[in-house]
Amino acid sequence: MGLTPMMRQYLEVKESCKDCILFFRLGDFYEMFFEDAKVASKELELVLTGRDCGLEERAPMCGIPYHAANTYIGRLVSAGYKIAICEQLEDPSASKGIVKRGIIKIITPGTYTDSSFLEENKNNYIMSFYLDDNMCAMSFADISTGEFNSTHSNFKEAVVLDEISKFAPREIVLEENIKESFIHTIKERFPNISISKIKQENFDYNIDNNLKEQFNNFNENEYETIVKKSANGLLYYIFHTQKNILSNINKIDYYSIVDYLTIDVNSRRNLEITENLREKTKKGSLLWALDKTNTAMGGRQLRRWIEQPLINKNPIENRLNAVEELLNNISLQEDLKEDLKSIYDIERIVGKVASKSVNAKELISLKCSIGKVPYIKEYLSNFKSDLFLNMEQCIDTLEDIHKLLDKALLDNPSLSVKEGNIIKEGFNEEVDSLREAKSNGKKWIASLEQKEKEETGIKSLKVSYNKVFGYFIEITKANLNLVPEGRYIRKQTLSNAERYITPELKEMEEKILGAEEKLIDIEYKLFTEIRDFIEENIDRMQKTARIISDIDCLCSLATVALENNYIKPNINAKDEILIEEGRHPVVEKVIPKGEFISNDSLIDTKENQLILITGPNMAGKSTYMRQVALITIMAQIGSFVPAKKANISICDKIFTRIGASDDLAAGKSTFMVEMWEVSNILKNATSKSLVLLDEVGRGTSTYDGLSIAWSVIEYICNNKNLRCKTLFATHYHELTKLEDNIEGVKNYSVSVSELENEIVFLRKIIKGGADQSYGIEVAKLAGLPSPVINRAKEILQHIEGDKEENSLNIAPSKEYKSKDYIEVSKDTSNTKNNLGSEIKHDTLSETNTDTIIEDESTKEHLSSNKKQINCRINDEKSIKKEVAVDSFQINFEYIKRDKIIEEIKNIDILNMTPMEGFNKLYDIINKTKDID
């Protein structure tokens, strides 16, 4: 048995989109078959059925109503799938044989433009990447807004990952032969990004002509070939999926990576620039703290400003001056914001115009939006700052477009453009004439109903309409005896009524329906003409939309500054960051007002180059370091900052090594990840960079960690090509000695108050190093059991009391009732264990600090040998094992007992079956066997 004609057609279409789920239009449904059906039924929770297809087995099948497709498509695209839409290309009733079908669009994560899928304040970027030898180029487009950005640089994975982190594309288009290891790196860092591959020829084909045709600002001599290839490949993919040249993508914007503040992937995450660390949502991020925008366009623009802070003084100061002027004119600012609230998403509306998917209601939204532009232009004329003056000169009021839309479209048109009820009365004579005919016909129908009621005496008689039978007279069965003989022609019999027609009624029906059909056709034709006119003027509307979004951003920054008592920072060229009473812009918003403790900061490239911060955990070191970085970023986007005074030098890069890393989930150790991040910082930072380092060396032994931290400080301060502004938090108090030996190191600490054996974190950064870590007190605050706290204090007293001796013997805790004992030897000579064999200990060489500091090359780093401390654990019968550890081991059997006791206390015996009770008892008995 052969395949059915319909199934042959399906398989032919499917062959052209193997990587997509094919939505195959059959009547009023999109059907999916074979593997596509299995995937869709699982993802969309649809019933999987079957269909005879000419094979021995029925083809797996599931389907969705075509009018509800967007909901299902959105779910599949969100899960990373691509959808190919195969439509009927001819009227089934007029076709002979099988209906002609074809793919009209391929929907992918980076090209989906349905408003229910998109976040209004966030771009939906698709990215292309092209690699050629040691150079790479990247292009980013948002087809819903028309943005298209390109850049290139020397190829470094870190650079590419930084740009991906900045733009957060939903999809990346790559050349099909690119190394899988690079794709793996991307997927490891950004698991939610969809990867698509195209052939090399799609990047190369007809480059200059394609770019000239698409971009009205393209000059082939201004762009490197690799940039043009990247842009060409992305344009090919967009056209391949959309089956259309999108007129809203009409300008290519080239940017240089070095023209903006570089914030690498880890730093964006650690500083919580646009999303918080825990939930990966906007709340709790810098963007959340600064976003008071009133338009979707402004929300997206503010995100871009925060993702790409400026590094040139003039544009930064232009923004700052504009924000200052808004703060000095509160009344004008409020008027501006009030009009901004009435502006819809112009960029995405004209994007729908370009894709021919806009409806009349959206054009009314466009009309209302551009109707506010003349008022905004008038407000701008009252300002004096350069940025506002330039905006006032450049903004297009679009009055001709507003006039057309106001004259042509009804204020409340139909949602569908193919159902009529779109064009306003007086715009077109033929529309008015047909509407009158339609209206008169319906009046005639109403008068007919009244006349028939009166002449027959049937009060319940009514004239109705449906699409199957047209107009008809309906009389209930109870009144059929009142129907005059021969007055009506029977049309349909129902269970409780009869339906009739008359020749006059059918004649009027033809007039009414003919008028309605013609009216719908004419209204749709007029609508497409209006849409085409708007499409011809997309560039004008996009320019105005960008100005509105900039105004919205500036108003947002002014509002936040006013509400939170921010001040205007001074931008200097002295390589100095001076902040008086600085505050963390996010933390102060999530704690009661006025409770945040402000702190001063002074960092430069000379005497205060590396600020060494000591103090206990939870005291506020990380918050302090982050606030310095965030204040710097805020200043460089043109925002006022949370401080009493701020003198900020422009930074080219910000690096952080703070907190845990996502790479831990990929199987990399804490220490390895930390060292990789530190290595990246030391290789890429410059004298213009700001570096935040928190607890460098914590992931290994004390001596190794101290040595590495010491060496990193030396490298930063003594390397003449580096000397970056650095905040360095540490628990290694030995490092505080470096202030006396290395130029630029300054000791600071977090003040702590001790009251009746309790500590209070004052959150104040003061000069001088901390004299102790308060680790046990922090552990107590964290809720460690009191036996652990008491034992820790006991051990600490032994260590501190005997630290000058060569060996340290710590007696076992009586509370633990353990027969083990621990001997920690610090003797540098050979000793003998209980079996008489020699145990050798490496010696920790005494380091001459002065010698290290005087070494100008900084290539000789702190060298020390790790001291192996052998712990011998003995019991009464024999030596069980011998281990070499970095500290001492403690028997924690009591913790196991506590857990078992707690488990027994929590047993709900009344709600357990006898068998459940028996199993629980058996489980507890097994657990107690592990306890001596």
Swiss-Prot record:
GO terms for biological process: mismatch repair. This is DNA mismatch repair protein MutS. It comes from Clostridium botulinum (strain Hall / ATCC 3502 / NCTC 13319 / Type A). PROSITE patterns: DNA_MISMATCH_REPAIR_2 (PS00486). One of its GO terms (molecular function) is ATP binding. Belongs to the DNA mismatch repair MutS family. ATP binds at residues 615-622. This protein is involved in the repair of mismatches in DNA. It is possible that it carries out the mismatch recognition step. This protein has a weak ATPase activity. Coiled coil: none annotated.
